[in-house]
Amino acid sequence: MKKEIIIVTISLGNDGAERILTELARQWVHDGHHITVIQTSPNRYGNEYALEKGIEQIEIHTTSSNKVIRFMQEIKELIKILKTRPNATCLSFLSASSFILAISSWFIKNRIVFSERNNPRKVPIGWHQQALRNFAFRFADTLVFQTEDARSYFPKSVQNRGVIIPNPINGKLPPPIEGEREKTIVTACRLHPQKNLPMMINAFSMLADEFPAYKLVIYGQGVLEDELRAQIKSLNLENRILLPGFASNILEKVAPCSMFVSSSDFEGISNSMLEALGMGLPVVVTDCPVGGARMVIKSGENGILVPVGDTQAMYEA
């Protein structure tokens, strides 16, 4: 049966949640459903991910520089849109958009689904942001969690409305490379403290002399770019550790590499890890909360799990 699904997000910026929602929207529209993506703050957070043809896009543009007034404008506009589509199921992946949708739910009749995409103990940052997230979850008809560990953080009233659904994987992955791979160790993520990229860089520096033909390529953008470049320069590895930025064709970039690595201190389920596994790359990742990596990797069989924060273990792996 054809369904109407509305995905509410602050933007289509270059983060994992936005990437998943674009993949889901693409699949659902192929399945014959009517899909609408509403961006509440497109101007402030960017549009790195393009939506497939056939997906309706609505952008809410606000004019005030005052955060409170802007927030109220976003809610007002969202309510106006949703009142014209009372039979649609509304889905939100991010805490900010979930809070906007939760307030809007007081005035609409739509079914509401929220999805927790990270470690709820760590994200969002700050007790007040977490309180807003927890408040928003009270108004969801259904909540989606990636792992049981993530669901267990919340009170029983939330857990009882929750389901565990791991991340989907792109159905159009490049096939595994046959023959010799490029001598490149690769990762793709936000340049953010959560990802603990300094540990990855230090681990690579420990093996750089042993394997002079190899390089480390870190795709992504973020607040730590200058700090990471300074670290790389201090290690005299500017020609061996590269930060090329965001890549819209990331699958083609990763497919020929020799190894995928993730050093996150915490994570939901890494999209880039799943895609690397699907393309046949050897994978070395930290066994971090909320348990997404250990759901799909049996260490020593289809990848290697290393302790969080253990540079030596990552080097040895």
Q: For each of these PLM feature ranges, what is it?
A:
Residues 7-69, 153-155, 223-224:
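N-terminal strand-loop element at the rim of the active site
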Residues 15-23, 183, 190-212, 218, ...:
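A conserved mid-protein helix/loop that constitutes part of the nucleotide-sugar donor-binding site
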Residues 56, 138-174:
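Donor nucleotide-sugar binding/catalytic pocket of nucleotide-sugar-dependent glycosyltransferases
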Residues 92-98, 116:
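Short His-centered aromatic/hydrophobic patch
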Residues 246, 265:
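Aromatic "clamp/platform" in nucleotide-sugar-dependent glycosyltransferases that forms part
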Residues 298-300, 304-311:
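Conserved acidic donor-binding segment of nucleotide-sugar-dependent glycosyltransferases
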